[in-house]
Amino acid sequence: MNDTVHKHITVLLHEAVDGLAIKPNGIYIDGTFGRGGHSRLILSKLSEQGRLIATDRDPRAIAEANTINDARFQIVHTAFSAIPEVCEQLGLTGKIDGILLDLGVSSPQLDDAERGFSFMRDGPLDMRMDTTKGLSAAEWLAQVSVDDLAWVLKTFGEERFAKRIAQAVVSYNKSATDKISRTLQLAQIIADAVPFKDKHKHPATRSFQAIRIFINSELDELEKALQSALSVLAPEGRLSIISFHSLEDRMVKQFMKKNSKGMGVPKGLPILESELNKNIPLKIIGKAIMPSEAEIEANPRSRSAVLRIAEKR
């Protein structure tokens, strides 16, 4: 077992914050405070009139945020899908100059065995971002059917052996006196069920990702946040989003593409293209940004990160 504990290093720190094109007097939202890397950098670029609101589901992130003693900063314990409600309560709807979302699980969450995110460390099988709400992974697995579990593994983990793994997990929980309650216990059941081993990837990688995404409704949260971003942002407000797996990145990419696409003007039509496309809500800023080789070497967990930036017209 690998017991390496990774120091939390904020991925694409400067690139994501630069993507916000910070105005010193602006109002910004860090939707995923985590351990505060992005928030602290944003604050360093704001004047005394600037403002930063951060949200996070994780109680430990909230505790970390409460150590920041800065009148320009405010933390709200909620999911980033609730940003529209937060803005409404603060009278800031349509006034936000930039929203940053870092969709990754933080190193402290992964490395803390008690959180149940890691298949490399033994701990209670929890996986909840907000440990005060909802079912833990163990509680959900104790009641799920083979078909439902297989669907989750296939849909959110793109796991080719989804059915086989689901059968093994549900069968174990039905036959054993004590149901699956530990991370390494689940990881071993998955490993035993998988007929083909990838030497570069632990056999439980995709399943743990899928269960975590489902337990935390991560893609639903992202969908809600994307759909509401346009109403929250001010004109020329920026959206800077870091994703860590293809499902998230696909959603972000499609959202930005769909909302930035105009119509070509048919030949001979007496209308300017700018007039025809004036209601396009977004403009994509640059190409997708990946971590540099140097960043990947310093922080291997950054390897799969993709940053996309867009601006409200």
From Swiss-Prot:
Catalytic activity entry: cytidine(1402) in 16S rRNA + S-adenosyl-L-methionine = N(4)-methylcytidine(1402) in 16S rRNA + S-adenosyl-L-homocysteine + H(+)
Annotated family: Belongs to the methyltransferase superfamily. RsmH family.
GO cellular component term of the entry, any: cytoplasm
UniProt function note: Specifically methylates the N4 position of cytidine in position 1402 (C1402) of 16S rRNA.
Originating organism: Actinobacillus pleuropneumoniae serotype 5b (strain L20)
Compartments reported by the entry: Cytoplasm
Gene from which this protein is expressed: rsmH
UniProt-annotated binding residues for S-adenosyl-L-methionine: 36-38, 56, 80, 102, 109
Assigned EC number: 2.1.1.199
Major place of residence: cytoplasm
Keywords of this entry: Cytoplasm, Methyltransferase, rRNA processing, S-adenosyl-L-methionine, Transferase
Gene3D superfamilies the UniProt entry points to: Putative methyltransferase TM0872, insert domain, Vaccinia Virus protein VP39
Gene Ontology BP annotations: rRNA base methylation
Protein known as: Ribosomal RNA small subunit methyltransferase H
Keyword hit for Chloroplast: no
One annotated GO molecular function: rRNA (cytosine-N4-)-methyltransferase activity
